[in-house]
Amino acid sequence: MEALRQRIEAAFEARADITPSTVDASVRDDVQNVINMLDKGEVRVAEKIDGQWHVHQWLKKAVLLSFRIFDNVVIDGAETKYFDKVPLKFAEYDEARFKAEAIRVVPSATVRKGSFIGKNTVLMPSYVNLGAYVDEGTMVDTWATVGSCAQIGKNVHLSGGVGIGGVLEPLQAGPTIIEDNCFIGARSEIVEGVVVEEGSVISMGVYIGQSTRIYDRETGEVHYGRVPAGSVVVSGNLPSACGKYSLYAAIIVKKVDAKTRGKVGINELLRIVD
């Protein structure tokens, strides 16, 4: 794996000179190998090691190289044709393979090859981009989008119209991460490498990027780029220092543990008790 990483790094440094017609066959094979490993979940752009998320930038470089190496081709769809560099993940699946991987894919759901979809996952008409990792038991609801290299944990619910931001460039940026057992409410957007920690509940219409203030009303603490584990979050605003205006913020209204989540429904958790 280390030798593969070094070859990808070297090819990326020379990317300005790489085109579909000039690329060396060995580089093409290395990049295709990485895409295949991402597709199978054998590697992932980010993984949690000793409680901390680590980003494997060389895998992102391989994904970016793929856009320089592979040319556009015609891709057959059920009701139309497409013209793109990245094939569709399920293009060669048959009934036996869908059953073996325990994936349910509703018509018009689009998943690009190089993204991993775990067992017992349901994909409503949605979009999962290249390099993404969607773990077991997750629901990607209608018109939800999982961006490039985003990491979605086990037993997550991405409600209708949710946007999970992608991140290929800038290269140093970390991917957006939704940890296990989270619920993301309809039309919410989590972007720019924000991490929503395990067991959190995000209400409908909450927008969180790196500059969004995430205010804990119980402690007065303000977080950036991270929703603490077990948070229940709604959209709101905070007053300016001068008191003349207010600006948007995400508000942590309460904290819940796994035991409470098991006993109480999502709708109940989102009811604010002053």
From Swiss-Prot:
SUPFAM superfamilies: Trimeric LpxA-like enzymes
Pathway: Amino-acid biosynthesis; L-lysine biosynthesis via DAP pathway; LL-2,6-diaminopimelate from (S)-tetrahydrodipicolinate (succinylase route): step 1/3
Gene Ontology CC: one annotated term: cytoplasm
Record-listed substrate binding positions: 104, 141
Localization per record: Cytoplasm
GO molecular function: 2,3,4,5-tetrahydropyridine-2,6-dicarboxylate N-succinyltransferase activity; nucleotidyltransferase activity
PANTHER family on file: 2,3,4,5-TETRAHYDROPYRIDINE-2,6-DICARBOXYLATE N-SUCCINYLTRANSFERASE (PTHR19136:SF52), MOLYBDENUM COFACTOR GUANYLYLTRANSFERASE (PTHR19136)
Membership in a protein family: Belongs to the transferase hexapeptide repeat family.
HAMAP family to which the protein is assigned, alphabetical: DapD
Name of the protein this chain belongs to: 2,3,4,5-tetrahydropyridine-2,6-dicarboxylate N-succinyltransferase
Organism: Shewanella baltica (strain OS155 / ATCC BAA-1091)
